[in-house]
Amino acid sequence: MRHLVWLLLLLAAPPALAKSPPRVDSAVYTDPVHDLAHPARMAVIHIPSGGVEINGVVYVAAGTGPHPVVVLCHGLPGNEKNLDLAQALRRAGWTVITFNYRGSWGSPGPYSFANDLADVDAVLAYARDPAHSQTLGLDPGRIVLGGHSLGGWATALTAAHDKGLAGAFMISPGNIGRFAKLPRAGAIEALRNNGMESLATTPEAMADELIAKGEAYDFVTAAPRLTGTRLLVLTSDDGGAPTADALVAGIRAAGGKSVTTAHAPTDHSWSDARLRLASEVIGWLRATR
């Protein structure tokens, strides 16, 4: 989404100020003790959604389960999948589910923003299914949803209606609903430049969907429905911080008191702040256990 974020500068206020970074969590750089009976492992899964099965990989934590779970959503198109973060979260004792939306990175079906949201719901349903939670050692009562960029947008809109989540975190969230305010030609060009090779759609179809949905895709409008959600919002110097700040302000104005925020002076992908990213998320997650 790196080619899109500059457009947010046209629709937003100045960026937030950075705070001091947290101490690097030991799980970022320390392997867990090898558990012969219950070793860390990977599992390939196929998640039913919209009449197809989307691709997923589970990073199962070491030790006797059930383990708390993070469902990690990638961005648009998803070049940065934050798998280093997934590994760090696993070392911290969380089992992490990663997946590819319909029509992206080999998952079958057409790509659309509506399908993104439906796919997130499908992954959560998969994790809560007793057959899968038992096989993978998941604790269905302790599922946290998180995402980067577009994945942060999907996280906000999903958490707004899924009250069974233990929490949610957003990393440099891209509020794609704001792009409905751009001229259609400008939105098409931005989407095309962002990289379409891995997506089963066209920039024209994506732009038309955004324009048709309008405010329904603006995550700031979800603020009143997030007041009871434990939420971590991480922003960066990518132009998108003001819309994330607006979401936080809206939640707090509506009475929400469980929002944690942090801002890092790095790019949209946190390219030079990977250890800080993992430490921010792990530190916040430790308080949910």
Cite the ranges covered by each PLM segment:
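Hydrolase active-site cap/lid region
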Residues: 19-25, 157-206
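Structural cue for short, hydrophobic secondary-structure segments
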Residues: 72-75, 98
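Alpha/beta-hydrolase active-site loop
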Residues: 111-137
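N-terminal cap/lid segment of alpha/beta-hydrolase-fold proteins
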Residues: 20-64
